[in-house]
């Protein structure tokens, strides 16, 4: 069924000879654009209907055309029909398949009023919109895992860091919800991108539109484009900003996941011992029997570079292309296909790693006040006593200097040492030199107080539920 029955190129009438073998190999894209076949067939059904509405197909011809497309779709799905290098691309392969099933007299009528230029621009949008929902669902799953960690450890304190140095104590739940919120913005970008992409280029033809009286709005409705057809046929066939934007979103997802990954790698070291990875989501060493390696996190970190590279390569391809369609745009698909493939493998594994993480409360809380991380609390306590912050900052810094010289933490300084540093440092300063007090005091919106984190948790859960609903809407 997949053998090539003659020359079914979609062009060639003005050429005396066929393309050179080297050109055919260079031009071939069916090995990577075959994944668009179901969308191409859906587009062909919609196109057949508007041909019928325009009087270019009879009722009987439409019925037989749809039946032939249905048979072709089934054969593609079960693998009995595939493209070959001689087909050049998915569009040519499927036209060959239709001609084999319907013959040239009927099968050949489907080409009227459309070009590969508007076909591929439409099919690519359909494909990416479907996978945007798949990726969006996987992001929501990862957010669910982070929410689960926050709910399981609502009162665990840990050292918050800036520049990877101890800064201020924070709740572990506060920390993981920060990652959940970043991923939520990625999910929001997908939803916003989908709304912008819900416009059909079908009917644009090669660039100038169609003279056959076809209805592009009917095709748009048939194919699920909520915002109808494009307003400019040249823009419809030539623009790939929707591809570049999608590639950026996937790269941003990779970057955000890589930030979590880097922390897991650090936290999993013996020196930190904040977390332990589940055996099912770790690997060993071929020579060192004691090793338990965070390969998922490391692969996430590495794949983020790959996703960024796909975006960069795509942008370089699109740069300075004149209107309208150019063959350079054949190169727009593989980078984005790869980004989708990578995320759809990476995100489930990463979610599994996070969902099965063991958190070591004692170790986190041991280090939460370390590194003089309560110094800011001293300064803010002084401000509440009426001391200007500039002075309070200097006094708190002096406390750190004295404690560091004595090999102590701030809460280990004596009342006499505090009094010697500043007359404002009365024994009451000790009320803020503890982690629970430091956490509870930061109760403004977005803060690390348990009450503030509870609000964040509820908001993230609501956002994740909305994301799941959007992702599942077209399944």
Swiss-Prot record:
Its EC number is 4.3.2.1. This is Argininosuccinate lyase. It comes from the Bacteria. GO terms for biological process: arginine biosynthetic process via ornithine; L-arginine biosynthetic process. It is found in: Cytoplasm. NCBIfam families: argH (TIGR00838). Keywords: Amino-acid biosynthesis, Arginine biosynthesis, Cytoplasm, Lyase. Gene3D superfamilies: Fumarase/aspartase (C-terminal domain), Fumarase/aspartase (Central domain), Fumarase/aspartase (N-terminal domain). Pfam families: ASL_C2, Lyase_1. It is an enzyme of class 4 (lyase). Belongs to the lyase 1 family. Argininosuccinate lyase subfamily. Pathway: Amino-acid biosynthesis; L-arginine biosynthesis; L-arginine from L-ornithine and carbamoyl phosphate: step 3/3. InterPro entries: Arg_succ_lyase_C, Argininosuccinate_lyase, Fumarase/histidase_N, Fumarate_lyase_CS, Fumarate_lyase_fam, Fumarate_lyase_N, L-Aspartase-like. GO terms for cellular component: cytosol. The gene is argH. It catalyses: 2-(N(omega)-L-arginino)succinate = fumarate + L-arginine. CDD domains: Argininosuccinate_lyase. GO terms for molecular function: argininosuccinate lyase activity.
């Amino acid at each position: 069924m997949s053998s090539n029955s003659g020359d079914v190129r979609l062009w060639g009438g003005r050429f005396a000879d066929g393309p050179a073998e080297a050109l055919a190999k260079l031009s071939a894209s069916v090995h990577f654009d075959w994944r668009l076949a179901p969308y191409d067939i859906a587009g062909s059904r919609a196109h057949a209907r508007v041909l019928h509405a325009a009087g270019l197909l009879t009722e009987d011809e439409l019925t037989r055309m749809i039946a032939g497309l249905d048979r072709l779709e089934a054969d593609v799905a079960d693998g009995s029909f595939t493209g070959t290098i001689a087909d050049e691309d998915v569009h040519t392969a499927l036209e060959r398949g239709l001609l084999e099933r319907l013959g040239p007299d009927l099968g050949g009528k489907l080409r009227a009023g459309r070009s590969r230029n508007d076909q591929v621009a439409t099919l690519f949008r359909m494909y990416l919109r479907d996978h945007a929902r798949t990726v969006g669902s996987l992001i929501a799953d990862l957010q669910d895992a982070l929410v689960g960690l926050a709910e399981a450890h609502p009162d665990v304190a840990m050292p918050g860091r800036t520049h990877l140095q101890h800064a201020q104590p924070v709740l572990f739940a506060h920390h993981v919800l920060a990652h959940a919120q970043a991923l939520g913005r990625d999910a929001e970008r997908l939803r916003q991108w989908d709304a912008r992409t819900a416009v059909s280029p079908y009917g644009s033809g090669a660039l100038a539109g169609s003279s056959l009286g076809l209805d592009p709005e009917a095709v748009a409705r048939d194919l699920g484009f909520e915002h109808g057809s494009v307003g400019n046929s040249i823009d419809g066939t030539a623009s790939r900003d929707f591809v570049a934007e999608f590639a950026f979103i996937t790269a941003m997802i990779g970057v955000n996941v890589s930030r979590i990954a880097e922390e897991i790698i650090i936290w999993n070291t013996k020196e930190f011992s904040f977390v332990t990875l589940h055996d099912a989501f770790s690997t060993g060493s071929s020579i060192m029997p004691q090793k338990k390696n965070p390969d998922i996190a490391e692969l996430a970190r590495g794949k983020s570079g790959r996703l960024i590279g796909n975006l960069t390569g795509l942008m370089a391809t699109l740069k300075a292309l004149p209107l309208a369609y150019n063959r350079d745009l054949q190169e727009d698909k593989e980078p984005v296909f790869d980004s989708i493939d990578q995320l759809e493998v990476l995100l489930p594994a990463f979610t599994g790693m996070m969902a099965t993480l063991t958190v070591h409360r004692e170790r986190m809380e041991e280090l939460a006040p370390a590194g003089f991380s309560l110094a800011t609390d001293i300064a803010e306590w002084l401000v509440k006593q009426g001391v200007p912050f500039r002075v309070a900052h200097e006094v708190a810094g002096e406390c750190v200097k004295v404690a560091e010289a004595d090999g102590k933490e701030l809460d280990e300084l004596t009342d006499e040492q505090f009094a010697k540093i500043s007359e404002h440092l009365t024994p009451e300063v000790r009320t803020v030199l503890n982690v629970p007090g430091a956490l509870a005091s930061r109760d403004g919106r977005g803060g690390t107080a348990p009450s503030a984190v509870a609000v964040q948790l509820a908001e993230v859960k609501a956002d994740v539920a909305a994301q799941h609903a959007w992702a599942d809407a077209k399944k």
